[in-house]
């Protein structure tokens, strides 16, 4: 019995070690969280998007995200992480909490945080020493500019209900694209430790 227990402990330690993959596998749970976040965003709808047509804006969702074939595996993970982090930051603001149903907003922020926590498990192992260089990586800079455009738009519109509705619809689009990127990463091997 002691031998079996020792063997199991060794397997767990190896799985979570630098060469293991248990901690960095893009799990089904991550995909389920992503789908749930999209459902929550859909439920947050307070206005008819048609009533806000005059406030529409093309935020220029980065083509690197839309056409993810352009991203290599080593770029896809940081772009996905940045997209989720920026989404969380957008909805975890004072202005956001004034615009949305508090319960739904808290559930959305919790769901985004769960996705980030899962990816954080992998982040150090996947990016390691390169982390400091990622801030300068073109796709990451593009994602940051995209979100800065959303922040600028909200400020320009005075954080109006219609502006938030337009942003909600845009974020559904962005999170749908990030879900597609997650699927693509999974098809690339799912184990983010593999070369």
Curated annotation (Swiss-Prot):
Domain of life where this protein originates: Eukaryota
Coiled coil: none
InterPro entries for this protein: 4_helix_cytokine-like_core, Interferon_alpha/beta/delta
Function according to Swiss-Prot or TrEMBL: Paracrine hormone primarily responsible for maternal recognition of pregnancy. Interacts with endometrial receptors, probably type I interferon receptors, and blocks estrogen receptor expression, preventing the estrogen-induced increase in oxytocin receptor expression in the endometrium. This results in the suppression of the pulsatile endometrial release of the luteolytic hormone prostaglandin F2-alpha, hindering the regression of the corpus luteum (luteolysis) and therefore a return to ovarian cyclicity.
Cellular localization per UniProt: Secreted
Pfam families, alphabetized: Interferon
Protein name according to UniProt: Interferon tau-1
Metal-binding in keyword set: no
Organism: Ovis aries
Main subcellular location: secreted
Keyword Cytoplasm carried by entry: no
